[in-house]
């Protein structure tokens, strides 16, 4: 939905575009912008983090995963590539679909009714054949974010319990979900702090200059709210 119309303008009028808000103040303001839209839709709350990195260089890539303490508020559908005992573990842990070559074939035929993919290491030969399908959608399992693992049960629990995978895009910007607009401010802040703490710890040694260059939060139907990077650097160092 386009961010236009009277309700969006009313929400945007609450935000000083030239101000960098303290974190607590920023989330309180975000809740006010949601109220100004007066929609029954439970919007997603997002964060954009502008980093001083060039992801085109492998030694400057920022990538990771964090389990948000209060989850994302979203229902996550999990597909698992596994065989034998690990397939049974995946089913028992609540995976939405489990398979091997049969699942590969379904995906090649157009099945994409899932939000994340987990695989045991021995299945990566099968999963690798789906690179052109899963890769562009950000669904390819990766050991760096815990989606290539023998402990499929834990990976499934994490995925369904609020795990967020993130990576710096071409311009060095990390986009991630923090929860829903119905969340209490304290829960949104806690999720934000968990994510930012990890992003700051992942600063590449090869990154030069200012690492945290800008950060903003918004609801899916609301204006962006810029936050004070100095406060965040002091808190998360």
Curated annotation (Swiss-Prot):
This is Large ribosomal subunit protein uL1. Keywords: Repressor, Ribonucleoprotein, Ribosomal protein, RNA-binding, rRNA-binding, Translation regulation, tRNA-binding. CDD domains: Ribosomal_L1. The keyword Ribosomal protein applies. PANTHER family: 54S RIBOSOMAL PROTEIN L1, MITOCHONDRIAL, LARGE RIBOSOMAL SUBUNIT PROTEIN UL1M. The lineage of its organism: Bacteria, Pseudomonadati, Myxococcota, Myxococcia, Myxococcales. One of its GO terms (cellular component) is cytosolic large ribosomal subunit. Transmembrane segments: none annotated.
